[in-house]
Amino acid sequence: MTTIRKNHPLFKAANSALIDLPAPASLSSLWNFGSLLGLCLISQIATGLFLAMHYAPETSSAFASVAHICRDVNYGWLIRNMHANGASFFFVCIYIHIGRGLYYGSYLYKETWNIGVVLLLLVMMTAFVGYVLPWGQMSFWGATVITNLLSAVPYIGESLVQWLWGGFAVDNATLTRFFAFHFLLPFVILALTLIHLIFLHETGSNNPLGLPSNSDKIPFHPYYTIKDIFGFLVLLFALISLALFAPNLLGDPDNFTPANSMVTPAHIKPEWYFLFAYAILRSIPNKLGGVIALLCSILVLLVVPILHTSKHRSLTFRPITQFLFWLLIADVLVLTWIGGMPVEAPYIITGQIASALYFSLFLILMPMASWLENKMLTW
C-alpha cells in the first residue's frame, strides 16, 4: 500500500500534499481555516449545482423558480439555505484566514499571498453576481448601484456599463450573464486554490512563532488530518444549525419582494460581508474617488509584504503592532456597522474617520510601529 501511495503518479501528489507533508509541530487552530475554506468551496459548488438544475435565469421566472425550489423540490429549502448561509461562512473563514496571515506574517510568502488576494477578489465577485440571481428587490437594486460604479471610469465609463448590462438597464441579458459568471467562477477559484497550495508547499507553512521550524516538523497525517476533520465537523454543525434554525437571519427582508425597477428600496445595501467595503465607498463624496477607495480597500493587502520592515516576522513579540492589529479589527467591525446604516449624521463622519484609519493603519501606522520596535530592540 505504501508503495502505491508513494509511487503512483496520481496518489503521490496527494500523498506529498496531505499525508507525508512535513508540517510545523506548533500550528494553532487558526491554521484550520485554509482547509475550512476548501470545505466551504466544495459545499458551495455541490449545493449550487443542485440549485442550478432547477433555477431559471430569466427575469420573468427567476424569483418564482427560487420559490419553486424551496416549496416543491425535495429538500430544495435545505439546499437553498445551505447555499445562501454557506456564503456567509465562506467569508467568515476567509476574513479569519487573512487576519491570521496578517498577524503571523504569512504574507512574506509573496506568491502565495498575492494569489490569495486574487482569490479574495474572485470570491467577492462570485458572491456579488450570485446575490443578483434570486431577482428580489435588493438583488436588482444592488446590481444596479454596484455595476453603475463602472460609469465613473473616465471616457469609457458609460459604454462599459452598457456593455456589462447588455442593454440600457439591468435586465434579462444582465441576469443571464450573471448566472453564467456565477456558474463559471467557482471552478476558476478551484483551479487558483490548487496554485495557491502549490506555492505554499514550495516554502512550507509558517508557524505561530514566526521562526524557522525545519528542526521541528511532524507528518501532516494523522496529526493535522484529525485536527482538520474536527474543524470540518464544527463548521458543518454551525452551518446546518443556522440553515435549519435561522436561515433568514443574515438576509435582507427586501429580497422577499420580486424585483421592481419602478420602486427603490429605502436603504440599498449589500450582504453583511461587503458592508466594510461599502462604507469605504460611501465615505468619499465623489463617484470616481469612491470606486478607487473601494478597490484599494482590498488591493491594499498587496502592499503589506512591501511595507514589512520589522526584524520579527510574527506579531507574537511585537506589542505595539499587536495593538494596531486589534485596532484594525475593531475598525473593520465599525465600518461593517456603518455600511448598514443610512447616509446621515453621525454615520457619515464616523464612516469617514473609520475609512481614514483603515488606510492609515496599513500604510503609515503599522510600518512606523515596526520601525519603532526595531529601534527598541537596540536600546
UniProtKB/Swiss-Prot annotation:
* One record GO biological process: mitochondrial electron transport, ubiquinol to cytochrome c
Q: Which SUPFAM superfamilies match?
A: a domain/subunit of cytochrome bc1 complex (Ubiquinol-cytochrome c reductase), Transmembrane di-heme cytochromes
Which positions does UniProt annotate for a ubiquinone binding?
201
Q: Which Gene Ontology CC terms are recorded?
A: mitochondrial inner membrane; respiratory chain complex III
Please name the PROSITE patterns in this protein's record.
Answer: CYTB_CTER, CYTB_NTER
- A GO MF label: metal ion binding
Q: Name the InterPro entries on file.
A: Cyt_b/b6_C, Cyt_b/b6_C_sf, Cyt_b/b6_N, Cytb/b6-like_sf, Cytochrome_b, Cytochrome_b_C_euk/bac, Cytochrome_b_N_euk/bac, Di-haem_cyt_TM
Cofactor note as given: Binds 2 heme b groups non-covalently.
| Key word Magnesium present | no
Q: Which residues bind heme b b566?
A: 97, 196
Cross-referenced Pfam families: Cytochrom_B_C (PF00032), Cytochrome_B (PF00033)
Which keywords label this protein? Electron transport, Heme, Iron, Membrane, Metal-binding, Mitochondrion, Mitochondrion inner membrane, Respiratory chain, Transmembrane, Transmembrane helix, Transport, Ubiquinone
Q: Please give the start and end residues of each transmembrane region.
A: 33-53, 77-98, 113-133, 178-198, 226-246, 288-308, 320-340, 347-367
Question: What broad class describes the main subcellular location of this protein?
Answer: mitochondrion
Residue positions annotated to bind heme b b562 are: 83, 182
What superkingdom does the record give? Eukaryota
The subcellular localization recorded is: Mitochondrion inner membrane
**Membrane topology (UniProt):** Multi-pass membrane protein
Q: Which cofactors does this protein require?
A: heme b
Assembly and partners?
The cytochrome bc1 complex contains 3 respiratory subunits (MT-CYB, CYC1 and UQCRFS1), 2 core proteins (UQCRC1 and UQCRC2) and probably 6 low-molecular weight proteins.
Q: What is its biological role?
A: Component of the ubiquinol-cytochrome c reductase complex (complex III or cytochrome b-c1 complex) that is part of the mitochondrial respiratory chain. The b-c1 complex mediates electron transfer from ubiquinol to cytochrome c. Contributes to the generation of a proton gradient across the mitochondrial membrane that is then used for ATP synthesis.
Family per record: Belongs to the cytochrome b family.
Q: What else is known?
A: Heme 1 (or BL or b562) is low-potential and absorbs at about 562 nm, and heme 2 (or BH or b566) is high-potential and absorbs at about 566 nm.
Q: What is this protein called?
A: Cytochrome b
Name its species.
Crenimugil crenilabis (Fringelip mullet)
